[in-house]
Amino acid sequence: MMSGAATREELSLTVDTAQWGWLRPHLERGGIIVVSPDLDLVEAGFGISSDDTAMVSEWIDTGRVAKPSATQIFDWDAEPDTPFRILIASPYVLVQPLSPLVS
């Protein structure tokens, strides 16, 4: 088993989907990080897990990674079936809302 940060390939194999209702407990412990749709989820996970502070700081400064806003939390609590792509980069759970289907 490798020590240190996971590789991009290893992280890509752990991307999954989950509904907000499953993710809510992670929010309560402060573990949810929202990744904007224009940032690759695996790249964000790699930057965080490898402690690339310069890159992660840039993402934070540009709003590409952030803690969920009160509005997002309110909306997701109202729709607990809201689907997300997720990636665990311990101690965080990185989430990207999946685009709703237009009907």
Language-model features: locations:
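N-terminal, charge-rich interaction modules
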Residues: 1-50
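Generic serine detector
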Residues: 3, 12, 36, 49-50, ...
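Residue-identity detector for threonine
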Residues: 7, 14-17, 53, 62, ...
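Enriched - but not universal
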Residues: 23-25, 62, 79
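Generic secondary-structure microfeatures
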Residues: 37-39, 60-64, 91-93
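Short, hydrophobic/π-rich interface segment
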Residues: 43-76
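Short, compact, well-ordered microdomains
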Residues: 67-103
